[in-house]
Amino acid sequence: MKSVFTISASLAISLMLCCTAQANDHKILGVIAMPRNETNDLALKLPVCRIVKRIQLSADHGDLQLSGASVYFKAARSASQSLNIPSEIKEGQTTDWININSDNDNKRCVSKITFSGHTVNSSDMATLKIIGDD
């Protein structure tokens, strides 16, 4: 009886761990402090080049106004892609997923993501959190 309980408990724990790993492959790629004046050279450099198929943007602190974003891939010719992003993100809001077309088989990795924008409606700097999904 004790061995049946032990096996059942082990299976239950392994199923929970398995499903948890599969349910959330999202990773926080980084956080950028947004200045109060419009700036077009805000960059999030990824220390480890990683394959990212889509991203979400979140305003953790303060409201943001964005005027552009680009993704740079680690490739021989420094390929990049302009992203279609919302122009404004309010504090506490998270965008829908924004697809990144790295290539046909999604094998190129992202080395840097750049943003243009600034903080609005606040004397403090807003923070932009970038979440990736592979």
UniProtKB/Swiss-Prot annotation:
Q: Answer whether the UniProt record assigns the keyword Signal to this protein.
A: yes
What keywords would UniProt list here?
Signal
Q: Which Pfam families does the annotation name?
A: DUF2541
The family database entries (InterPro entries) matched by this protein are listed as: UPF0412_YaaI
Q: Which residues form the signal peptide?
A: 1-23
Q: Which family does it belong to?
A: Belongs to the UPF0412 family.
Report what the protein is called.
Answer: UPF0412 protein YaaI
State the encoding gene.
yaaI
